Amino acid sequence: MNLSYNDYYTTSGNQDTWEVHLKPCTQKSTTYHAECVRAAQLIAEESSKQIVLMFSGGIDSEFMLNVFKEAQVDFKVAIISYGKWNKHDAIYAFDYCKLHDIVPDIIDLDLEQFVTSGLIYEIAEQGHCSAYQMTSVMHGIKDIDGCIVMANCEPQIGKNYDGKWMWDEPERTNCYRHWYQYAGIEG
């Protein structure tokens, strides 16, 4: 499975050589919500593995779960737990799962050990990651057997300096793409 449908979206380089490459659109898009439902269905069609949705308890990952449910796509849910360090967020994920009769897979990660062991730096290097908070997620997903799908905030769309609308893809979010490729993760 490609990391973007039909390699529509690809990147190259990092730091000073960071580039985003987009192919021309082949069809007119509809609403953001409808396109998300379509994306969920395309992921299901393309995936060779069980779909695993990473759920943080944030509104973006809750939206993702609701979209996959609406698309009638079979999925499992995984939650990364850092114990006391993300209890304030994870509680929403656990409450949602309980309310919707979902039994999540829980990935326990000792955040202090992850940092003090130097693994945080090793993964940052391997994934070309410039955002320390993403490395623990990268570590948490590496051993999940499935097609890993994550939500990552709303689309970053705004007006450019010349008044034209643009889509902004920060380099830091691309570290997941590097990590998926490095670790052989489908998603």
Predicted regions and their residues:
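Nucleotide-activated chemistry modules centered on ATP-dependent adenylation/adenylyltransferase
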Residues: 1-52, 67, 73-187
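Catalytic nucleophile loop
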Residues: 60-61
